[in-house]
Structure formats: C-alpha cells, structure tokens
Amino acid sequence: MKKKKALPSLLYLVFIVLLPWGVSFSFNKCLELWIKNWWNTRQSETLLTDIQEKRILERFIELEELSLLDEMIKEKLKTHVQKPPIGIHKQIIQLVKIDNEDHLHIILHFSTNIICLAILSGSFFLSKKELVIFNSWVQEFFYNLNDSIKAFFILLVTDFFVGFHSTRGWELVIRWVYNDLGWAPNELIFTIFVCSFPVILDTCLKFWVFFCLNRLSPSLVVIYHSISEA
C-alpha cells in the first residue's frame, strides 16, 4: 500500500515542481514576439511619453550628458537649428530603445506569471484525487517517524524559515519576486517585509506547536523544546 501511494505521490511532486518552470519558459518564448510587435506598433503612434521623457532625462544625468545638452541649447539659440546634434539624437534613440525594452520586460513577465498561476491553479483543481493521495502519503510518512526525528525536522524547518540567518534569505526571495515580475526595487518594502514576515511566520509556527501539535503528540513537543533549548 505504501509503495502504491509513494510512486504517484512522487510523480505528482515532480509534476508540480516542473510545471511552473516549463510553463514560464514556453510562454516566454511564445509571447515575446507578439508582445514586442504590439508594443512597437503602439509606440510608433507617439514619439515620447511624459514618463519616457523623465526617465531619459534621468539617464542623461547619470551619464553626465548635461554639458552636451547645454551646448545643444546654446547652439540652438545662436543658429535656430531645429534638429539636435547627431550624437545627441542617436543617444536619445538608444535611450528610447532601452526604455522600451524595460517596458517589454515588465509586460512579458507579468503576463507569463498570470498565465502560469492560472494553469497551476487549474491543475490543482483538476487533480484533486492526486492531491489527496499526495497529502495522505506525506502525513503517513511523517507520522511513521519516531518523535526524535519529527522534532529534528520541525526544528530544522523553523530555523530555516524564521531563524537568525533567515532574514537574508527572505530578502533574496522578495528581490527575486520583484525581479521576476519586472518591478523596480523598493528598499522600503524590502525592509518592512524582512522585518515583519518572519515574525508573523514565527508566531504561526509557535501557535501550531503549542496548540495543535501538543494535542497530537505531547511527547513530541517535550522533545522539541528540549532540543531547541539545548
């Protein structure tokens, strides 16, 4: 009976792990060309939006091109030339292309993540039977362990997610999420998340240990506290 449950459960676990990666890779390739054509067609209607102009000016400042802009303005006042110098014109075109690539990156990743989430949710809904088998197999595997090993695994998981060094890991996670979604980094949100989320998670784990696990196996709770206080 255990072997019959183990094989489908392991296959289901592999499926759940590989599905998001496969969907993300496939739709990235499929949607990239379509979104690029749509965005370029849309952008051809206008030269520069206010947001693009602001970003381009900021990048000029970063590239220390203010002196070139001043020269262009002085030259325009003297000669009333309507077109900017060729070098500045090329730089503007290059910055517009970079700005468009940033927008494409955000739209592509956001669309891919929405589709991936929808497919993953649909797979959970359509595979309720496999999910029940997997859940029962995990519970059976965990309950068959002796209390010392159970306490070790619980302590390992809690220290991994809410331990002293876990804040660095959560910071990497939130930065990866922002990068994957194509959002601009926000240090304030990163700090708030790293300071608050591990505390909330630690409270939930303690509640589970004291109130839920204590009812199922009081001896396990005693061993857990003995190991954690050692």
UniProtKB/Swiss-Prot annotation:
Similarity remark: Belongs to the CemA family.
Lineage: superkingdom: Eukaryota
Organism field: Agrostis stolonifera
Record's GO cellular component terms: chloroplast inner membrane
Keywords attached to this entry: Antiport, Chloroplast, Hydrogen ion transport, Ion transport, Membrane, Plastid, Plastid inner membrane, Potassium, Potassium transport, Transmembrane, Transmembrane helix, Transport
Protein name, per record: Potassium/proton antiporter CemA
Single GO molecular function: proton transmembrane transporter activity
Function: Contributes to K(+)/H(+) antiport activity by supporting proton efflux to control proton extrusion and homeostasis in chloroplasts in a light-dependent manner to modulate photosynthesis. Prevents excessive induction of non-photochemical quenching (NPQ) under continuous-light conditions. Indirectly promotes efficient inorganic carbon uptake into chloroplasts.
Gene transcribed to yield this protein: cemA
